[in-house]
């Protein structure tokens, strides 16, 4: 099979970004969007550590200095104007520092390319995905279309991830602007690939768009992230990013196979 031969060729040099056992951090970023999400997480985590240390210091100090032994007669404090101003302004400033980059990233995630190089349509079914490449057909021809099913647990090949590998991967060119159109054929689904920073819901009756720029060659694993029925856990997503030349060869071979 053409897709499997391409997969074997690039498997030795390409990174495989998938979930790992006992993983605590993010997967390696493969798009500017995911890199922005990771950077924002690290920046916010820095503020969280500062707040945690300050609150713990206040609690320990209060327990140490204001107990029955050191302060047998407690003071009755109704209010303090200075401290109230401080604990109102200081958290507001922290939230402002967090909100500015958060909104900038949020608006960049909502941006849709006006003229993408490639458009791919992902259609969610119970329980598999269908992909359409409609840029390579004329008006009277069928789009390049294929279904993507999970590899059964009892039939994996050497090196394949359990419940994450599929029979037909989504092949895309690296360093090329892509537009993903996501929609379902039945119920709610969600097309999500963590390394790409993409999670696009498939809502019945709607076409949702998202833009992707894969910056490096590799194999990226995801799953349906919206509960969609009994076999929801068996709807993996595999995106393989290759060079533009190999992508063109793959498209040509797929078109030949489809016409035959």
From Swiss-Prot:
One GO process term, biological-process aspect: electron transport chain
EC code(s) of this entry: 7.1.1.9
Taxonomic superkingdom: Eukaryota
GO cellular component: mitochondrial inner membrane
Predominant place of localization: mitochondrion
Residue numbers on the Mitochondrial matrix membrane side: 65-84
Organism: Triticum aestivum
Protein name according to UniProt: Cytochrome c oxidase subunit 2
Function of the molecule: Component of the cytochrome c oxidase, the last enzyme in the mitochondrial electron transport chain which drives oxidative phosphorylation. The respiratory chain contains 3 multisubunit complexes succinate dehydrogenase (complex II, CII), ubiquinol-cytochrome c oxidoreductase (cytochrome b-c1 complex, complex III, CIII) and cytochrome c oxidase (complex IV, CIV), that cooperate to transfer electrons derived from NADH and succinate to molecular oxygen, creating an electrochemical gradient over the inner membrane that drives transmembrane transport and the ATP synthase.
Mitochondrial intermembrane side: 1-43, 106-260
Presence of keyword Transmembrane helix: yes
Binding site for Cu cation A2: 224, 226, 228, 232
Keyword Transcription: no
Reaction(s) the record says it catalyses: 4 Fe(II)-[cytochrome c] + O2 + 8 H(+)(in) = 4 Fe(III)-[cytochrome c] + 2 H2O + 4 H(+)(out)
GO MF term list: copper ion binding; cytochrome-c oxidase activity
